[in-house]
A protein has these predicted regions:
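Short aromatic-glycine-(Arg/Gly/Cys) micro-motifs in beta-strand/loop hairpins
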Residues: 1-23
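Short, conserved beta-strand segments within well-ordered enzyme catalytic domains
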Residues: 3-5, 30-31, 56-58
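Short, charged/polar surface micro-motifs in flexible loops or helix N-caps
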Residues: 10, 35-38, 61-65
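Surface-exposed loop/turn and secondary-structure junction residues enriched for glycine/proline
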Residues: 14, 19, 28, 140-142
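Extended catalytic/binding region for NAD+/ADP-ribose chemistry, centered on the ART fold
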Residues: 20-45
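Conserved NAD+-utilizing ADP-ribose enzyme module
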Residues: 23-24, 44-156
Length: 156
C-alpha cells in the first residue's frame, strides 16, 4: 500500500518526537492512502508561504496483525468519543496504529459544536452519519513506524 504525508518539508525518516499532542488520533505520525488528502494537508503550509511537500511511503498491510490497531469504518459514537479524548489530552490507550476518518472542516465544525456543549452527542452523530470519511492513519509507536518505508517526495 502507498501512503502519503503532507507537510512543508520532505520527511524521509518519520519520528514521534515532532508529533503534536491533542489531535484527532493522539500523538503520532499521520498519513493517508489518498493523495488528494495529503495535498490538502499541504495547503495550510502553502497559505503561510511555505512549500507543500508530499512524502510517499510503502507499507505492507500484512504486518498489521503484529500491531495493536484501532479502526473506525465510519464516523460513529466510538469515533467521536476517541477524537474528543485525544483532543482533550485524556487518551490513555496504547494502540500502535489508529485508522479512521479525518475531521475535515464540516466534520470539525460538528465536533467543535459538540465539544463546546452546543449540540448533544445524538445530534453530532446524526450530522456526521452522512459524511463520507476521508482516511487517515496514525502511526503512534516506533514499532508501527518501523513498517513505513520512504519512497520519495514531491514539492507541490
Amino acid at each position: 500500500m502507498i501512503l502519503y504525508h503532507g507537510s512543508f518539508l520532505e520527511i524521509a525518516k518519520p519520528d514521534l518526537v515532532h508529533s503534536r499532542p491533542n489531535v484527532d488520533f493522539g500523538r503520532g505520525f499521520f498519513v493517508t492512502p489518498l493523495y488528494e488528502q495529503a495535498a490538502k494537508w499541504c495547503g495550510k503550509f502553502k497559505r503561510r508561504g511555505k512549500d507543500g511537500v508530499i512524502s510517499r511511503y510503502g507499507y505492507d498491510e500484512n504486518w498489521e496483525a503484529e500491531l495493536k490497531t484501532l479502526k473506525f469504518d465510519s464516523y460513529s459514537e466510538e469515533w467521536l468519543d476517541f477524537i474528543l479524548n485525544c483532543r482533550s489530552g485524556k487518551d490513555s490507550t496504547d494502540y500502535d496504529l489508529v485508522v479512521g476518518g479525518v475531521a475535515n472542516d464540516k466534520v470539525f465544525n460538528t465536533v467543535e459544536l459538540f465539544f463546546d456543549g452546543l449540540i448533544d452527542k445524538t445530534e453530532a452523530i446524526n450530522r456526521l452519519r452522512y459524511e463520507k470519511p476521508n482516511l487517515q492513519i496514525c502511526f503512534r509507536t516506533e514499532k508501527a513506524l518501523s513498517l513505513l518505508h520512504f519512497e520519495g517526495s514531491e514539492t507541490l
